[in-house]
């Protein structure tokens, strides 16, 4: 990436995304692949474009993303968080609109650990009276 770029780190579940944003034509590259090729589901692509659509910058920036860890949903959420932070780096005035939509706050929900003596995190073995 040549010239001025804007950076944002996004996290969601166990995914971490590093987002590099530069003035351009609206091309989004995730781990070397176009976003439409990387994310099979439409929901992932939609989630990624939300902050850009909100700020009316869908075709103003070329975005290059490196994302590691987690699954499809977690990675999409991490990229959205990173794009939001990069947009704030570009123009701090956008923060209020992005914050009102809930994109600035990191979603802190994580998988709850499995406990000893239970089948899952909270699911106990079936109880039989007789």
Curated annotation (Swiss-Prot):
GO process terms (BP): translation
Highest taxon above the source species: Bacteria
Entry-linked InterPro entries: Ribosomal_Su5_D2-typ_SF, Ribosomal_uS9, Ribosomal_uS9_bac/plastid, Ribosomal_uS9_CS, Ribsml_uS5_D2-typ_fold_subgr
Keywords: Ribonucleoprotein, Ribosomal protein
This protein's record includes keyword Ribonucleoprotein: yes
GO molecular function, one term: structural constituent of ribosome
Entry GO terms, CC: cytosolic small ribosomal subunit
UniProt-listed PANTHER family: RIBOSOMAL PROTEIN S9, SMALL RIBOSOMAL SUBUNIT PROTEIN US9M
Family, per entry: Belongs to the universal ribosomal protein uS9 family.
Protein name in the entry: Small ribosomal subunit protein uS9
